[in-house]
Design a protein with these regions (language model features):
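Flexible, glycine/charged-enriched surface loops at secondary-structure junctions
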Residues: 81-89, 100-103, 180-181, 240-241, ...
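Short, Lys/Arg-enriched N-terminal segments with co-localized hydrophobic residues
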Residues: 1-11
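N-terminal intrinsically disordered, cationic/polar leader segments
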Residues: 13-64, 72-76, 82-97, 104-140, ...
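Catalytic-core signal marking the mid-to-C-terminal active-site face
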Residues: 14-16, 20-22, 28-47, 58-70, ...
Length: 530
C-alpha cells in the first residue's frame, strides 16, 4: 500500500470494507456524516467496569505477612490518636482497647476481628436505578476530581472556583459516557459561604445529574444534612434500607483521627452509608520514605479506622482507601505517577483483598500546572496502575491538575475520554471462535490484506477503541483546520458538551422539596466564610 492508504483504514466504512469485490462509489458526504456520528454527544453511561483481567500483585505472601505483623505491632505498641472525641475513646475502651489520654492502643487481632463485619461488596444506589454501582469484587467505579479550590480553562486561566463552575462540572460528568459517578466536591465553590456551600453542591448533584454522588464531610451537621436531603430525594424508607452515599473520610496521617472526620463517619456509619477510610500519604512527610514502611502505616491506619466504623454499626459499608504521593525533596512539592506510588498502590490493593474490603486509590494524578505532556504522562501512569492494582472506587479519575489544587475543564474531558481505554483494557482478550479469526486468515492467505475480508467487515466498527477527542487526521487536514493541539480540541469539546446538556428528569414535587430544604437551612444561619 501507499502511505496515504493508512488513512483509508482509519476512515473505514461498511462500504469501503467491501472494496476488494465492489467498485468504489463516488463521494456523497458519507465520511462527514460518519465522523459526526462518532463525535456526537451522548448521555449514555457505560456500566461500571467489571474486570476480566488479573490484578497485578507485586508482593509475596511472606512480605504481606511481615507488613501485617508490623501493622498489628504499631497498633498495640504505638497506638493511634482519636483527638477531641471522648465518645470514641469510650467506645474503644468498651471494645477492649487500652486508652491513655487520647491515645488508643489496640490489642493484636482486635482491629482485624472488628473489620470482619464490613461487607466485601455493596451497592450504591443512584436516583436512576440504571446508574447504580456495585463497589467491590472485580468492579471499578470511576468518579471525578474532588476538592480543588481553583479551576482552570483555556480562556480564563487559573482562578478561584464558583458555584457556576461546580454546576458546569456536574453537567460535564453527567454527559461523560465513561464516568460512572458524579463525585462530591468537584471544585470548592468559594463564592458561597463555607457553612452553606454543601447544600448547593448536593442540590447540583441531585438535580443536574442522575448518577450516584458523595455527601459532605466538613462538619458532622453537614453529614446529617446530606442524609436528610437524600431522604427527600429517595424517600426515608429507602435511605434507611439502602446505601445512597459514599463519603470521603481522610485520616490525618500519621495515625491521627480528628473529630471532624470521625464525627462525619459516625453519622454516616450509623445510617448505613458508605465511608472511604483513607490515609493521606505523602511519602517522606506523612509516612516513611520506604514502600514497606508506608504500607505498614497505611494498613495500621485503615485497620483502626474501619474497626471504629464497625463499632458505630457492625456491617456498615466501608472502602479501604489510600491517597498516595511522594514528596520532591528539593522543592517540597508532591509528585505523582512515580514508581514508588505504583508500588504502594499495588501493595495496598493486595492488603485490601486480604481484608476482604473494597479498595479506593489512584486517579488522574499529576503535578503539572497545565494539561500538557507532563500531565499526560503522570496521569496515564496513575490511571493504569489503578486498573491493574484492583482498585474498586477511583476518585479523582478526571479533571485533576496541579497536585489537586486545580480542577481543569479541558483536562476533565481529556481524562474522561481516556477512561474509555480502561474499560477496554479490563475486558481482557476475547478468545471466542470469531475472535480467533481462522476463517479470515484462510480467506486472505499469504501476501493479501484484511481490509475487504468478511471478518473485518463484520467487526471493524467495534474492533478498536477510538478516542472521541484526539486528532487522527493527516497533517494537511490538521493544518488546514488550525493545527489545534489537544487542549484546544478539549476546549471545543467542553463547550459542545455544555451546549448539548439535557437535564435529567426529576419529580417536580421532589425538586421543590429539595429547594425548600436548602432555602430553610440557609435562612436559619448567618453566612460564614470560616
Amino acid at each position: 500500500f501507499r502511505a496515504t492508504d493508512s488513512y483509508w483504514v482509519i476512515a473505514m466504512t461498511d462500504e469501503t470494507a467491501q472494496t476488494a469485490t465492489a467498485p468504489r462509489r463516488g463521494r456523497g458526504g458519507g465520511g462527514a456524516a460518519r465522523r459526526a456520528e462518532r463525535t456526537a454527544v451522548s448521555i449514555e453511561t457505560a456500566k461500571y467496569i467489571q474486570r476480566n483481567i488479573p490484578n497485578y500483585e507485586i508482593m509475596t505472601e511472606e512480605a504481606l505477612d511481615v507488613i501485617q505483623a508490623n501493622a498489628e505491632q504499631i497498633l498495640e505498641e504505638i497506638g493511634v490518636a482519636f483527638v477531641d472525641n471522648p465518645a470514641a475513646l469510650e467506645r474503644w475502651k468498651a471494645a477492649g482497647a487500652e486508652v491513655t489520654g487520647e491515645r488508643v492502643r489496640i490489642p493484636k487481632g482486635l482491629a482485624r476481628k472488628l473489620c470482619e463485619t464490613a461487607p466485601a461488596t455493596f451497592t450504591q444506589h443512584a436516583r436512576n436505578p440504571e446508574r447504580s454501582v456495585e463497589i467491590g469484587g472485580k468492579n471499578l467505579v470511576l468518579a471525578p476530581v474532588y476538592g480543588p479550590p481553583f479551576v482552570r480553562d483555556a480562556e480564563g486561566g487559573r482562578r478561584y472556583a464558583t458555584i457556576a463552575d461546580f454546576q458546569k462540572f456536574v453537567k460535564l460528568g453527567y454527559m461523560s459516557k465513561w464516568l460512572h459517578h458524579s463525585g462530591g466536591t468537584v471544585c470548592e465553590p468559594t463564592d458561597v459561604p463555607v457553612n452553606k456551600r454543601h447544600l448547593d453542591m448536593l442540590l447540583a448533584h441531585m438535580t443536574l445529574s442522575d448518577k450516584p454522588f458523595m455527601g459532605s464531610v466538613t462538619e458532622p451537621e453537614r453529614a446529617q444534612d446530606s442524609i436528610e436531603m437524600c431522604e427527600i430525594l429517595f424517600g426515608k424508607d429507602f435511605v434507611r434500607d439502602n446505601t445512597v452515599l459514599v463519603n470521603l473520610i481522610n485520616i490525618n496521617s500519621p495515625m491521627t483521627f480528628d473529630s471532624t472526620m470521625m464525627g462525619a463517619l459516625e453519622i454516616y456509619a450509623a445510617h448505613n452509608q458508605a465511608c472511604i477510610i483513607s490515609p493521606f500519604i505523602v511519602g517522606g512527610a506523612m509516612a516513611p520514605v520506604s514502600v514497606a514502611g508506608t504500607l505498614t502505616q497505611v494498613l495500621a491506619e485503615v485497620l483502626a479506622g474501619v474497626a471504629y466504623s464497625q463499632l458505630i454499626r457492625a456491617g456498615a459499608p466501608v472502602i479501604m482507601g489510600a491517597f498516595v504521593t511522594s514528596i520532591d525533596m528539593n522543592s517540597g512539592a508532591p509528585t505523582f505517577g512515580t514508581p514508588e506510588a505504583a508500588h504502594i498502590t499495588y501493595g495496598v490493593g493486595q492488603l485490601a483483598r486480604r481484608l476482604g474490603l473494597p479498595y479506593r486509590s489512584a486517579g488522574s494524578f499529576c503535578g503539572s500546572k497545565l494539561p500538557d505532556a507532563q500531565a499526560a504522562y503522570e496521569t496515564a501512569n496513575s490511571l493504569n496502575m489503578g486498573l491493574l492494582a484492583g482498585v474498586n472506587f477511583m476518585l479523582h479519575a478526571c479533571g485533576w491538575l496541579e497536585g489537586g489544587l486545580v480542577a481543569s475543564f479541558e483536562k476533565f474531558v481529556m481524562d474522561a475520554d481516556q477512561l474509555g481505554t480502561l474499560h477496554h483494557l479490563a475486558k481482557g482478550v476475547d478468545m471466542s471462535e470469531d475472535a480467533q479469526a481462522l476463517d479470515a486468515i484462510r480467506e486472505v492467505g499469504p501476501g493479501g490484506h484484511y481490509l475487504g475480508c468478511a471478518h473485518t467487515h463484520a467487526n471493524f466498527k467495534t474492533a478498536f477503541w477510538r478516542s472521541d477527542l484526539f486528532d487522527y487526521k493527516p497533517f494537511e487536514t490538521w493544518d488546514e483546520e488550525g493545527a489545534r493541539d489537544t487542549q484546544a480540541l478539549a476546549s471545543i469539546r467542553v463547550q459542545k458538551l455544555v451546549d448539548t446538556y439535557q437535564q435529567p428528569t426529576l419529580d417536580p414535587e421532589i425538586h421543590a422539596a429539595l429547594l425548600a430544604y436548602v432555602d430553610a437551612k440557609k435562612a436559619a444561619m448567618p453566612d460564614s466564610f470560616m
